[in-house]
């Protein structure tokens, strides 16, 4: 059995990446500003507490910046893998054998699941977002498999991916 994800998952992954990177950079910049402010105050006043605060803020800012860069590289690698795999690789013919109308929670997202018995001998799950048109049980149709993780219903859907 292979898991099939839709294009909405890819969009949500991209949005999540932007939010995470923005938050990481914002916090890192905030600590850099605090560190710079403390360093300036240290020179003006000559207080040791400002020196400690500036060193701590600089260390935290540097750690957050490095963490954000690592996080960015991880997301970029993940997104490039997903983007590479979004080209149609093969057509398969399959029959919907079962539809589970009760929404399932998959990676924090709610999906309606359909089990497709494909002619290539592999049963695949098709995850549909809530509100999508659910195929009827017994429907035989040509599906376009994209990197074994995503199935489009029509050729135009596959080309648009």
Feature map (PLM): residue ranges:
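Alpha-helical transmembrane spans
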Residues: 7-83
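Glycine-centered tight beta-turn/hairpin loop motif at sheet-sheet or coil-to-beta transitions
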Residues: 117-123
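A general secondary-structure signal for short beta-strands and their flanking turns/coil
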Residues: 89, 109-111, 139
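Short, charged cytosolic
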Residues: 1-5
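A membrane-cytosol interface segment of integral membrane proteins
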Residues: 126-161
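Structural detector for short beta-strands of small beta-barrel domains
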Residues: 84-105
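Well-ordered beta-strand positions in beta-sheet-rich domains
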Residues: 91-93, 123-125, 141
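Short aromatic-glycine-enriched beta-strand elements
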Residues: 102-117
């Amino acid at each position: 059995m292979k898991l099939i994800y839709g294009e909405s998952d890819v969009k949500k992954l991209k949005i999540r990446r932007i939010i995470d990177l923005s938050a990481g950079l914002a916090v890192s910049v905030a600590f850099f500003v605090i560190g710079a402010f403390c360093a300036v105050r240290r020179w003006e006043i000559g207080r040791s507490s400002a020196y400690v605060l500036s060193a701590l803020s600089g260390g935290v800012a540097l750690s957050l910046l490095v963490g954000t860069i690592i996080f960015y590289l991880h997301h970029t690698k993940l997104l490039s893998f997903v983007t590479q795999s979004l080209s149609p690789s093969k057509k398969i013919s399959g029959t919907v054998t079962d539809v589970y109308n009760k929404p399932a929670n998959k990676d924090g997202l709610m999906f309606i699941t359909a089990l497709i018995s494909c002619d290539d001998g592999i049963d695949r799950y098709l995850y549909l977002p809530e509100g999508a048109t659910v195929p009827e049980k017994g429907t035989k149709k040509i599906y376009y498999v994209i990197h074994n993780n995503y199935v489009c219903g029509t050729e135009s859907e596959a080309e648009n991916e």
